[in-house]
């Protein structure tokens, strides 16, 4: 189905991995702890944005006075993710595409999560060993919707951007793929993969 492309690039959360519930619960716990309001449509719109940038935007949006640094809040959320991941994370149906192209096409993961979190999540879902590169938000200057994440994936795989196809669930990620000059697959529209992140 994707034979025309030289490389396949995947977002992780909501695309390769069903983790929407995990991230919603850990965001709710984090925002509650630090007194930041929960705005469901706003959180949904920030899907795919790294935790640091999400927190900065929320504090700015609500004009919050928070007695903690952004780093402290990110550390709290990441710890909750590690503690609760085993309860809420599993691979999506895209694992079939990954298996079908393993050894035939180079593949990479480009995510708004930290690289360490991504590697841990992929391992937990039995997806480690399939990807030539895993690019987390900590590896790029500008996260999605900037193209940096997917451009670095392509560079690490040794493939030109125009020869890549990106699988994404979030508008920010689809924008990033377009800005990188790559074909993009909206996994909800094409593969019926739903992200249950802040639906209500």
Question: Can you say where each PLM-predicted feature lies in the sequence?
Answer:
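Alpha-helical substrate-recognition element adjacent to the catalytic core
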Residues: 30-62
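Helix N-cap/coil-helix junction residues
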Residues: 36-38, 64, 127, 158-159
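Asp-based, Mg2+/Mn2+-dependent phosphohydrolase catalytic module
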Residues: 1-7, 99, 114-200
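Active-site neighborhood of HAD-like aspartate-dependent phosphohydrolases
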Residues: 1-43, 179, 193-194
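An amphipathic alpha-helix signature
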Residues: 24, 28, 51-56, 74, ...
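Short, acidic loop-to-helix structural element flanking the phosphoryl-transfer center
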Residues: 4, 82-109, 113-115, 119, ...
């Amino acid at each position: 189905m994707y034979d025309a492309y030289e490389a396949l690039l995947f977002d992780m959360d909501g695309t390769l991995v069903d983790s929407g519930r995990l991230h919603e619960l850990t965001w709710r716990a984090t925002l509650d702890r630090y007194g930041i309001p929960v705005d469901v449509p706003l959180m949904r719109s920030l899907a795919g944005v790294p935790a640091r940038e999400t927190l900065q935007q929320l504090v700015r949006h609500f004009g919050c006075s928070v007695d903690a640094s952004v780093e402290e809040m990110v550390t709290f959320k990441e710890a909750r993710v590690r503690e609760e991941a085993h309860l809420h994370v599993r691979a999506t149906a895209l694992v079939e595409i990954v298996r079908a192209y393993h050894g035939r096409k180079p593949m990479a993961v480009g995510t708004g999560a930290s690289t360490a979190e991504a590697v841990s999540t992929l391992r937990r879902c039995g997806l480690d060993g399939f990807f030539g590169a895993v690019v987390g938000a900590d590896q790029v200057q500008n996260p999605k919707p900037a193209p940096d994440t997917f451009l670095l994936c392509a560079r690490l795989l040794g493939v030109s951007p125009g020869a890549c196809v990106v699988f994404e669930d979030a508008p920010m990620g689809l924008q990033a793929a377009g800005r990188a000059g790559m074909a993009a697959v909206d996994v909800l529209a094409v593969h019926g993969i739903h992200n249950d992140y802040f639906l209500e």
